[in-house]
Amino acid sequence: MKPAARRNARHFAIQAIYSWQITKGNVAEIEQQFLSDDKFEEEEHQADAPILAAPHTDLNYFHDLLNGVVQNHQELDSKMRPYLSRPLQDLDQMELALLRLAMYEMTKREDVPYKVVINEAIELAKIFGAEDSHKFVNGVLDKAAPTLRKK
């Protein structure tokens, strides 16, 4: 699978994870909404966002990321807690979604190099996060990587 297809899967997954966090909705319904809303066909996006189309998105990876984060969110939260400078409940919901996604990839998807996980999380934070979210996400993941992944 091409790296761009996984990047697109992450792009959709972060939005779906954020939606799940905000609504606490059924993850299968959220996933179906993303699959049926033509989001994989034509996504209105910022100029620097990737072009998102079904042939260019790894749908299996999207499914794995979304469901993996939802099913393991408590474990992921406990793994990130030691690296946070503030309580989990004080995190912005998008920062929390970004960190959960990255922690999932770092701990459950060892086929993805940790440097790729960190770089992709930073890029997503630049697109979806607040002004300095990418710096915060980078700091947390840089501290967590040596413990969670043997470099």
UniProtKB/Swiss-Prot annotation:
GO cellular component terms, semicolon-separated: cytosol
Domain of life of the source: Bacteria
Pfam families: NusB
GO-annotated molecular function: RNA binding
Single GO biological process annotation from the record: DNA-templated transcription termination
UniProt keyword terms in alphabetical order: RNA-binding, Transcription, Transcription antitermination, Transcription regulation
SUPFAM superfamilies, per database record: NusB-like
InterPro entries cross-referenced by the UniProt entry: NusB-like_sf, NusB_fam, NusB_RsmB_TIM44
Heme found in the keyword field: no
Function field: Involved in transcription antitermination. Required for transcription of ribosomal RNA (rRNA) genes. Binds specifically to the boxA antiterminator sequence of the ribosomal RNA (rrn) operons.
PANTHER family: ANTITERMINATION NUSB DOMAIN-CONTAINING PROTEIN (PTHR11078:SF3), N UTILIZATION SUBSTANCE PROTEIN B-RELATED (PTHR11078)
Protein's name in the database: Transcription antitermination protein NusB
Gene: nusB
